[in-house]
Amino acid sequence: MALTAAVKEELSRLEVRKSSVRKAEVSAMLRFAGGLHIISGRIVIEAEVDLAATARRVRVAIAELYGHQSEIIVVSGGGLRRGNRYVVRVVREGEALARQTGLLDSRGRPVRGLPSVVVNGSTADAEAVWRGAFLAHGSLTEPGRSSSMEVTCPGPEAALALVGSARRLGIAAKAREVRGVDRVVIRDGDTIAALLTRMGAHETLLVWEERRMRKEVRATANRLANFDDANLRRSAQAAVAAGARVDRALEILGDDVPEHLKYAGELRVAHKQASLDELGRLADPPMTKDAIAGRIRRLLAMADKRASDLGIPSTEANVTLEMLEE
């Protein structure tokens, strides 16, 4: 599954219980995916999204939070568009919902950015704004030199509001206009990882980080000259770097790490140059390569999330340039 679809699928399944946070997400989603239309003298709200799961999430939230009914219209793909699109439409009480979600102000005028109650909300509200905006019009590319997370915005005011929400989360994002389209862009790999964590896309983060690490190790190996066995060198470097990250992860989590993850981490630290196959054979009872790798990934992800929450250096802080040198 492409990374963008994976993030949206995961976020569409994320359970959020606090009403104010759900409302912030709905407001952002309707603002970034939707529009107000006048049909037969009545205000109609429409929001177009990529996934059926996302459309259902919006529909359920509108019903539970605001008591309004909506319909989902399937738009078949064709031409430049691949796959179906899903339009959530609110016909009855459209104006009431527009006022409740901040699409219209108290005088009935369209709000160009995001409503002040959302902009000035809690940190969890800021996370919800990004979740809603990404579900509406976000994209995530493969990690590498040109990796990026982008959200297409309905206008410059909405883009600046999204940048402000990112800033409140400690995330550096930039608003740009490209060929007349306003976008908010993040290109730094660590920043993308931090925002995926903030939005709640933990499963996709693990996949993204694994691909990122693989590409970084490959790029480092390609830069090494006159080495007879590049694959062996690359594996050894990756193992040493992983050992350093695990060491930091155990330090961050302390006694709060699950026993099975702690055991896998201690194996990695004790045998820093061993391959994953060798670590699996050293385990008692023995484990497969995939099992030991999965536990280490979960340990690192848990520690990086804790570090992000506490505002302290992540596991990457333990990886030094010397580890990648001969």
UniProtKB/Swiss-Prot annotation:
Keywords: Cell cycle, Cell division, DNA-binding. GO terms for biological process: cell division; regulation of sporulation. The keyword ATP-binding does not apply. Pfam families: HTH_WhiA (PF02650), LAGLIDADG_WhiA (PF14527), WhiA_N (PF10298). InterPro entries: Homing_endonucl (IPR027434), Sporu_reg_WhiA_N_dom (IPR018478), Sporulation_regulator_WhiA (IPR003802), Sporulation_regulator_WhiA_C (IPR023054), WhiA_LAGLIDADG_dom (IPR039518). It comes from the Bacteria. GO terms for molecular function: DNA binding. Belongs to the WhiA family. This is Probable cell division protein WhiA. It comes from Renibacterium salmoninarum (strain ATCC 33209 / DSM 20767 / JCM 11484 / NBRC 15589 / NCIMB 2235).
